[in-house]
């Protein structure tokens, strides 16, 4: 009787183990194909999703520049006289701070731009006391000062909105600006001038 029960127990354990190991490949938590986007990575190496989209082939192409941004795709397309020469991944304005759409043009270029609205409150030693603040809404704690967020290769298109180098978590996350990988922001920056048309579609 005891021997029979023990044999049944061992059989159940073996079957359970087989189901568990067979299921690991199908469970996305154990799949090598799992991609974690921004914020919580569930034990995966930290960092944004791999960029397999962005490229630049415009250095040897002549022609009038223009940019088309497609918010639904989170991509920017750079043209010279109608010829596509570059594509960039983006992170545009998050919900409630949406990037505007319409027809614009580059109104300012600033390679070392720093935001006057968004950044951190820091102490006298430069330590962050309150991160990610909007100075129009977030009160400044005593003994701190505002330090604006760097926005390299800034290309302003309207009011406080522009294209610039920034972090891309894999989804719309900005305060309204159009973030790009730094190497793409640099290529776009050197290829536009004030007046370059920028079309943003939804």
Predicted feature residues:
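N-terminal pre-domains immediately preceding structured catalytic cores
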Residues: 2-202
């Amino acid at each position: 009787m005891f021997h029979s029960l023990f044999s049944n127990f061992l059989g159940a354990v073996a079957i359970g183990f087989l189901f568990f190991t067979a299921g690991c490949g199908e469970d996305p938590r154990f799949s090598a194909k799992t991609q974690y986007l921004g914020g919580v990575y569930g034990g995966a190496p930290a960092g944004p999703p791999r960029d397999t989209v962005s490229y630049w082939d415009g250095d040897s192409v002549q022609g009038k520049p223009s940019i088309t941004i497609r918010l639904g795709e989170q991509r920017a397309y750079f043209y010279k006289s109608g010829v596509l020469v570059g594509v960039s991944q983006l992170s545009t304005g998050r919900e409630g701070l949406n990037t505007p759409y319409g027809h614009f043009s580059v109104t300012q270029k600033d390679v070392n731009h720093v935001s006057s609205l968004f950044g951190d409150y820091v102490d006298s030693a430069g330590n962050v006391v309150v991160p990610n603040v909007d100075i129009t809404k977030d009160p400044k704690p005593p003994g701190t000062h505002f330090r604006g967020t760097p926005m390299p290769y800034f290309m302003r298109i309207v009011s406080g909105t522009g294209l610039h180098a920034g972090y891309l978590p894999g989804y719309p996350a900005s305060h309204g600006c159009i973030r790009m990988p730094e190497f793409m922001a640099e290529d776009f920056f050197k290829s536009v001038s004030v007046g370059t048309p920028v079309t943003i579609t939804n």
